[in-house]
Amino acid sequence: MADILTQLQTCLDQLATQFYATIGYLSTYHDNSPATTPTNIPNAAPALAKIPKNSTAPPVPAGAPVPSQSSPPPPQTQRGASEAAADPNLPPAPDSPRTFASRQRELARDLIIKEQQIEYLISVLPGIDSSEAEQEKRIRELEAELRGVEEEREAKIRELRTLGRTLERVMGAVETGIYGDRAVLERDS
């Protein structure tokens, strides 16, 4: 298992990916219906028909006379649903309001769950609720504990070497035989 900081970084990366995917879904599959204007505020947002569209003509200097507008290009013919689905350049059809709302709730729930995972990982980071002095004290305690464990390890290594030498003598005795040279065995012990 990875350490807490690695898990936290992974969760943050996943959260960023989820944000990107959520925004992508919402902008792709929304029906883009106009927002309803508040009834108590007249002209809160101008109707789209009143907003002039950007001109494709080159910019004209401020003092120059404005040329007359040519007739707008004829509207494009409506394409059939099968033709629109076959063209990869067209955006996909929006989801039904029910499906869109369901998926929107699911995406929001996923974002909340990931955010809660991140909060949990942050809460279990060491030192979150302790002062600098307490953290330094804890580090000194851990250093002392580490020294003790290291001394135990070195003692076990010495014991292992002693047992290894004893085992070599026993193996030598077996090699010499039970009734062989007992003087060698007595001398080594």
UniProtKB/Swiss-Prot annotation:
Transmembrane segments: none annotated. It is found in: Nucleus. GO terms for cellular component: mediator complex. InterPro entries: Med7/Med21-like, Mediator_Med21. The keyword Plastid does not apply. Residues 58-76 have a biased composition (Pro residues). Keywords: Activator, Coiled coil, Nucleus, Transcription, Transcription regulation. One of its GO terms (molecular function) is transcription coregulator activity. Pfam families: Med21. Residues 127-170 form a coiled coil. One of its GO terms (biological process) is regulation of transcription by RNA polymerase II. Residues 50-102 are annotated as: Disordered. It comes from the Eukaryota. Component of the Mediator complex. Belongs to the Mediator complex subunit 21 family. Component of the Mediator complex, a coactivator involved in the regulated transcription of nearly all RNA polymerase II-dependent genes. Mediator functions as a bridge to convey information from gene-specific regulatory proteins to the basal RNA polymerase II transcription machinery. Mediator is recruited to promoters by direct interactions with regulatory proteins and serves as a scaffold for the assembly of a functional preinitiation complex with RNA polymerase II and the general transcription factors. This is Mediator of RNA polymerase II transcription subunit 21. The lineage of its organism: Eukaryota, Fungi, Dikarya, Ascomycota, Pezizomycotina.
